[in-house]
C-alpha cells in the first residue's frame, strides 16, 4: 500500500478527485481555479469534452507557496503537473525554482504582477469595461468607484487612449488589493469567460495571451 506524504492528505480529503487524476493543475488560489473552470467549460462546448474526460483535475493551492508544494508532491508520485499562478510574491521564488527543476510547467504572470493586474494590463479596453461592470454588479458602485476616488464609471469608460494606461494600472491594483474584487471561484470563472472572449484580439506577444495558449497547449486533446 502506497502512503501519500502528509502534506497532500488534506488536499485529497477536500478534493478527492485529485487522487484519481492523471494530470494536475495546481492553481495558486480560487481566482485561478475559476479561470481554469471557465476554460474547461469552453473546451466542453467547443470540442465536446472538458478536462475531466482527459483525467485532468484542477486544485486550489490556497496561496502563499502551498500550490508549488502540491505540484512538487504530485509530480514526485507520478502526476504530470502544471502550476498557474501570479508572480507578485518574491518569497516563493525558491519554490518556483524547485518546481521548474522538477520538470513542472509554470504558467506565470509578468514579474511583480497578479492575475488581476495582468488582465487589466493586457485585455482590450472593451474587456476592461466588462470587468469593471462585473465588479460593480457584484460589489456595488460605492466600493468600486466612490471609495477609490475614481470619479465615475462614465469617466473611466470614455477615457482617452492615453489615459487608459493609467486607468488599467489603477483598476488592476485595486482589484488585487484587500478589496479583492474577484477572489473566489465564481468570480474567477467570469474572468475566464472574458479572457476567452477577447484572447484572439490580444497582441500575440502579450503575457495574458501567452498564458492562455500555454494552458491550452498543456491540456492538449489526449483522452486516452
Question: Language model features by range: what are they?
Answer:
Residues 1-4:
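Conserved beta-strand-loop-alpha-helix hinge in the C-terminal portion
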Residues 11-26, 30-224:
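Acidic, Mg2+-coordinating catalytic modules of nucleic-acid enzymes
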Amino acid at each position: 500500500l502506497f502512503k501519500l506524504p502528509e502534506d497532500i492528505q488534506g488536499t485529497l480529503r477536500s478534493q478527492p478527485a485529485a487522487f484519481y487524476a492523471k494530470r494536475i493543475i495546481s492553481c495558486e488560489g480560487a481566482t485561478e481555479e475559476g479561470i481554469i473552470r471557465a476554460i474547461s467549460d469552453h473546451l466542453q462546448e467547443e470540442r465536446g469534452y472538458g478536462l475531466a474526460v482527459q483525467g485532468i483535475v484542477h486544485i486550489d493551492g490556497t496561496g502563499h507557496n502551498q500550490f508549488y508544494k502540491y505540484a512538487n508532491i504530485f509530480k514526485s508520485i507520478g502526476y504530470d503537473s502544471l502550476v498557474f499562478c501570479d508572480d507578485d510574491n518574491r518569497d516563493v521564488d525558491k519554490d518556483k525554482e524547485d518546481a521548474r527543476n522538477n520538470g513542472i510547467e509554470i504558467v506565470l504572470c509578468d514579474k511583480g504582477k497578479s492575475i488581476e493586474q495582468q488582465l487589466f494590463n493586457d485585455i482590450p479596453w472593451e474587456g476592461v469595461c466588462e470587468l469593471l461592470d462585473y465588479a460593480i454588479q457584484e460589489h456595488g458602485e460605492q466600493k468600486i468607484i466612490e471609495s477609490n476616488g475614481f470619479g465615475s464609471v462614465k469617466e473611466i469608460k470614455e477615457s482617452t487612449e492615453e489615459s487608459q494606461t493609467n486607468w488599467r494600472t489603477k483598476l488592476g491594483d485595486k482589484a488585487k488589493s484587500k478589496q479583492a474584487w474577484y477572489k473566489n471561484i465564481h468570480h474567477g470563472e467570469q474572468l475566464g469567460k472574458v479572457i476567452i472572449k477577447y484572447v484572439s484580439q490580444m497582441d500575440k506577444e502579450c503575457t495574458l495571451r501567452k498564458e492562455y495558449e500555454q494552458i491550452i497547449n498543456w491540456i492538449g486533446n489526449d483522452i486516452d
